[in-house]
Amino acid sequence: SLVGSEMCIRDSLNAVDLILFVVPTKAIRNVAKQVNDYLSRSGERPVLVHASKGIEIGSHLRISQMLEEEINPNYYRGLATLSGPSHAEEVSREMLTMVTAASQSLSLAQEVQGIFMNQYLRVYTNTDLLGVELGGALKNVIAIASGIIEGLGYGDNSRAALITRGLAEISRLGIDMGADPLTFSGLSGLGDLIVTATSSHSRNYQAGVYLGQGFCLEDVQIKINMAIEGLSTCQAAYELSLKRQVEMPITKALYQLLYQEAEVETLVKLLMQREGKSEARVDHFI
C-alpha cells in the first residue's frame, strides 16, 4: 500500500549513514522536501551527498544551498558533493575514474572519500565546496558551446581554444565569488570540462552538436530526451555574470543563441572580433 511504502521509505532513510542525491537540478528542491518529510531527529544523523551539477535560475543557488534551504539542519550531519570526470556509462562498467569529494568540513570530505573509494574509483578531497560546485555546473555550458563548434564543422584548434577560454571564464566567475583558483585546474574543473566538452557520452556536448548542425532547441531536446543541464545553467550563469559584472563572452553568446534567437555564425564572428586582450595575469585569468 501507499502508506506501507511511505513507512518503508521513512524507515530506510532513518537507518542510513549517507543519502546520495543524483537528480537533475530542477528536481532537487522537490526531492529534498520529500526527504525532509521522511527524516527525523532520532538516531544517527546521515551525511547528505549530491552528485548533481547545476545552478538554480533566479536564485542562483548551488545544489548544496538548495539542500540547506529545504532540509532541516537538525536532520543531517553535513553536506558534501562528488564531482569530476565521471560518465555513468564508464563508472557502471568499473572503468578507472577519479573524482573529488568536497565539503566545507575536511573530516566530512574524508569520510565520503572513504565510503566511495575502491579499486576503480579514486576519490580526492577538497574543502572548496563553492569552487567544486561551480566548476561542475558551468562546464556544461562550455560543453554545449564545444558541441556547437563540432556541429559547425570547425577543427580541433577551434575546440581547444573554446575549452581553454571557457575555463578562463569559469575561473573568473568562481574567483569573483570567492572560490580557490586552484580548484578549477583540478578534477571538478578542468577534468570535468575536458570529458564533458569532448565526449559523445555527454548530453550537453551532443546537444551542442545538434545546435551547430542547425536543429532548433525544441528538436534538440526531443533528440536527447534526457536532462540537458547546461541549458538552464547557461541562463543562471548569464544572470550571475550580469549581477556580478564578470565578463563571460562564451556564456553570453550561448545565452543569445538559446534564448534571444541570435544566429550562431554571427555569434562566432563577434567572439573572434572582440578587442585584443592579454591572455592572463599571475593572479587569475582575464
Per-range role (PLM):
Residues 146-150, 175-185, 191-286:
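NAD(P)-dependent Rossmann-like dehydrogenase/reductase catalytic/cofactor-binding core
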Residues 38, 70-78, 96-183:
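Internal alpha-helical scaffold of NAD(P)-dependent oxidoreductase catalytic cores
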Residues 13-14, 18-94, 112:
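Rossmann-like NAD(P)(H) cofactor-binding subdomain of soluble oxidoreductases
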Residues 2-9:
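Short, small-residue-biased leader/transition segments that mark boundaries at the very start
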Residues 8, 142, 190, 194:
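Active-site His/Glu-centered metal-binding helix of metallohydrolases
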